[in-house]
Amino acid sequence: MNDGVSTPVWLHIGPLEIHETVVTTWLIMLVLVVASILLTRRLSLQPGRLQAMLEGVVLTLESAIANADSRNARRLLPLIGTFWIFLPVANLLGVIPGMHSPTRDLSVTAALALVVFFAVHAYGVRQSGLGYFKHYLSPSPILLPFHIISEFTRTVALAIRLFGNIMSLEMAALLILLVAGFLAPVPILMLHIIEALVQAYIFGMLALIYVAGAMQQTTESPITSSSRSTSGAP
């Protein structure tokens, strides 16, 4: 774990500084990509133990997504599944001595939140076409500024929530180690693992809720719908 808030600079390329956060983030992605290729290159119709375990992981992720949106579980699996695989690894990197989680850097969590922000609208447009944006004018166009503010504030909250929790977790662990010395490593390690997994799950679940909500938006306003039901129109 690192005892500082800022991440150290590992490399200078002219005026450009490459921070440890960038290196560790790309390293995690490289490891996950290579592991995915190696683990899936020999898939069989008669799975062995390893393939059965991997299929169980995928089915578990798909089932969790289906609980929120059963109709679009397959379509959402690549995005949400990636979050639920990348984030636990990133959050748990701080357990390794001399390393710290890239998610304790606000720039990383902000980038992840922006991915969610753009994914919400991409999936919404893919589902409903450009008519998806009409829901920002519902129930009245005067509420458009409030809808826009809501979109940005929840994106900021998504970034700050993950950053704040991982940062506070590592700082609290450091303070406990300074006070209790070597009497506390095992409880701290367990706390770190549990909290890292919980925060990864929460981030992925919030992303799932936002994207699924966008895909379920209809182009018909509530006012039109209620007037039709009142008048008895089909």
UniProtKB/Swiss-Prot annotation:
F-type ATPases have 2 components, CF(1) - the catalytic core - and CF(0) - the membrane proton channel. CF(1) has five subunits: alpha(3), beta(3), gamma(1), delta(1), epsilon(1). CF(0) has three main subunits: a(1), b(2) and c(9-12). The alpha and beta chains form an alternating ring which encloses part of the gamma chain. CF(1) is attached to CF(0) by a central stalk formed by the gamma and epsilon chains, while a peripheral stalk is formed by the delta and b chains. GO terms for molecular function: proton-transporting ATP synthase activity, rotational mechanism. InterPro entries: ATP_syn_F0_a_bact/chloroplast, ATP_synth_F0_asu, ATP_synth_F0_asu_AS, F0_ATP_A_sf. Key component of the proton channel; it plays a direct role in the translocation of protons across the membrane. The gene is atpB1. The keyword RNA-binding does not apply. This is ATP synthase subunit a 1. GO terms for cellular component: plasma membrane; proton-transporting ATP synthase complex. The keyword Methyltransferase does not apply. It is found in: Cell inner membrane. It holds the Pfam family ATP-synt_A. Keywords: ATP synthesis, Cell inner membrane, Cell membrane, CF(0), Hydrogen ion transport, Ion transport, Membrane, Transmembrane, Transmembrane helix, Transport. The chain crosses the membrane at residues 20-40, 76-96, 105-125, 162-184, 195-215. CDD domains: ATP-synt_Fo_a_6. GO terms for biological process: proton motive force-driven plasma membrane ATP synthesis. It is a multi-pass membrane protein. Gene3D superfamilies: ATP synthase, F0 complex, subunit A. Belongs to the ATPase A chain family.
